[in-house]
């Protein structure tokens, strides 16, 4: 194995900690960097950055590597958070983790690491990279642990980024990562996994959004134009949402799915022109099912779109099982996906990602659903 100078992104979590340990064991020259990507809440109960850095520094001490604290908050605010707010204000539901990976962890962080003389960077993502022996192209693969695979969030990475990236824990199950952490005495071996969007932390999402987006209340209507209540603003809801609607509809035990009087309500549409939130009853209501989508902001791992006329695996949300999809009309600006089986709550602003088996091909941002 070729030995490299590798800069590891140490987050304070167990995955990046084991990543650093594995690389050190393999004989690489390893340096740790803690990325501070958000500082608006430094004095808030919701900010874990200071605690995370203490954990990361303790990990570096156990592993036996140096660690540097680097502030990327300005880049994050300009490249990720500003786009996050624009998307919500436009009525879509963005995934900032996808943009953070492309713009911060594998661009700003990568550039910083290269300036330090690194040949590679490594993170604790559950994914894999390999170079195809026939095409010599770098491929992004799913992590071996299907319950933890994070290739969906990495689908915008290009050849230059992948060629310099390493994901050691992508070859392991999460249980193995925890076991290694305990065996070598890592102080964060039992630290719980982080959840949610990094700059929101554990606070209620609506409370956070209130600080940046003004409320524009409007009507909540069902599929028969019956008024059921008022919403606080379309930006605060996402397709498929069930809780927080304030209109009741608790499902009775044994009630049928698909529109019974006692079925729960789900957000089905956001009509921006009339500021109307449309809701329907039943998980399998036709308004929640989609046969096709259009995507823009395209990024293909290989640098070009996959061949048409073949069914690929697809995901329109994280942790969704792969669903067959046919791609057509692919241009540098966008593509269309058609689904043999209807997909539930396909949401504009989220990513549509294609797979050929375990190989992540890339994808785009969902712009329209069931276009005519």
UniProtKB/Swiss-Prot annotation:
EC number: 2.8.1.13
Disulfide bonds: 100-198
Record has Transcription as a keyword: no
Chain residues that bind ATP: 9-16, 35, 124
Domain of life from the UniProt record: Bacteria
Region (Interaction with tRNA): 148-150, 317-318
Active site (UniProt): 100, 198
Molecular function (Gene Ontology), one example: ATP binding
The UniProt record lists the keyword Protease: no
Residue ranges of the region described as Interaction with target base in tRNA: 95-97
UniProt KW keywords: ATP-binding, Cytoplasm, Disulfide bond, Nucleotide-binding, RNA-binding, Transferase, tRNA processing, tRNA-binding
Group of enzyme by EC: transferase
Subcellular location: Cytoplasm
GO biological process, one term: tRNA wobble position uridine thiolation
GO CC annotation, single: cytoplasm
Reactions catalysed according to its record: S-sulfanyl-L-cysteinyl-[protein] + uridine(34) in tRNA + AH2 + ATP = 2-thiouridine(34) in tRNA + L-cysteinyl-[protein] + A + AMP + diphosphate + H(+)
Predominant cellular place of this UniProt entry's protein: cytoplasm
Matching InterPro entries: MnmA-like (IPR004506), MnmA-like_C (IPR046885), MnmA-like_central (IPR046884), MnmA-like_central_sf (IPR023382), Rossmann-like_a/b/a_fold (IPR014729)
Site (Interaction with tRNA): 125, 350
SUPFAM superfamilies (UniProt xref): Adenine nucleotide alpha hydrolases-like (SSF52402)
Function noted in UniProt: Catalyzes the 2-thiolation of uridine at the wobble position (U34) of tRNA, leading to the formation of s(2)U34.
PANTHER family in the cross-refs: MITOCHONDRIAL TRNA-SPECIFIC 2-THIOURIDYLASE 1, TRNA 5-METHYLAMINOMETHYL-2-THIOURIDYLATE -METHYLTRANSFERASE
Family recorded in the similarity comment: Belongs to the MnmA/TRMU family.
NCBIfam families the record matches: PRK00143.1, trmU
Protein known as: tRNA-specific 2-thiouridylase MnmA
Organism in which the protein naturally occurs: Delftia acidovorans (strain DSM 14801 / SPH-1)
Gene: mnmA
